[in-house]
Amino acid sequence: PWWRSERSGAGRKIPEYEKRGTPNDPERLPYRSELSEKRPVWRKRIDTVRVLDAKEWIVGLQKKGKGYSSIHSIRGVLRPAFALAAESDFIRKNPFDFELKEVLINDSSKRDAVEPSVEKRFLDFVKNDETYRECYDGMFILFKTGLRVSELSGLTLRDIDMKERTININHQLQTTGHKGKYIEETKTNAGTRILPMTEEVYEAFQRVLANRKAPKVEQIIDGYSGFLFLDRRGKAMVSYQWEKRFQRAVEKHNKENKRKLPKITPHICRHTYCTNMAKSGISPKTLQYLMGHSSIEVTMNVYTNLGLVDAKREVDRLEAMKEINEKEQAGKRFRMA
């Protein structure tokens, strides 16, 4: 059993992790080499690994040049492995159960939402570009629904109810280098949801269905088939393919236009949707449902970070409403007099 090994229990969990993937982030697989290096912390029995050992090793990763996001992913493999050992009473305390901000500098780049004008410029370019116009509807849907790109990739014909105008999100399509494509549950329990379509999203799905060229043999992945978004070989598109198309579309736009676009990714589309919905005045609980956030705190951070410009705009709106109400009240008093 892994808990009796001379090595860390976390290291022994890697084969199972590679086999099943993780519900949070399959991109963590490249970091398994960090876990298998023979460092002092891994030569200890798991019941002798202290919080100090874990923190020193984490700090050492950043000193070696690992980014905050990468270290966050690595720790995301270790913490649940040690948590399992703690729950099974093989260790008293999880040494990796601490906040990274306690020991690391967050040097990760902030993924801001793009302004509506930037979103429009990007989508207009994609729509009219000979190379990338075939991606337009998928990119449009990402901007207008806030779907995770893995959720979009996993959509099948059965998940789209055009009569009820709903999108059924209950799985996602992932891929790893050694395992290939596979179906996974949504990132969180809250990720399983049914989303209503707006008119423009409904029209986008109409185009997707009309333009989808059914392959001679539908690809079947873990029992799922009829994927909506296919590449030129008739295979289901996955996250990295969407990310590359976004990257290359922005690069092509910036090469052809003096007015440059910022970096735009599928996740920025999601953050943009979330921000726009928060600005529109939607309730936090409703937005939490639409986004599939497991915690209301994640959703509330969007409201907290809207910024001074948005705060000023909201104050101005309230002031304008106040003036209108005062004028209406004055008019009523005048008529009564």
Put a short name on every predicted segment.
Residues 1-90, 108, 130-133, 235-241, ...:
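N-terminal core-binding DNA-recognition domain of tyrosine site-specific recombinases/integrases
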Residues 48-51, 63, 92, 116, ...:
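Phosphate-coordinating loops and pocket residues in cytosolic domains that bind phosphorylated ligands
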Residues 105, 113, 172-173, 291-317:
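Catalytic-site neighborhood detector that most strongly recognizes the C-terminal catalytic loop/helix
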Residues 164, 175-177, 181-192, 199-201, ...:
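C-terminal secondary-structure termini that scaffold catalytic or DNA-interacting sites
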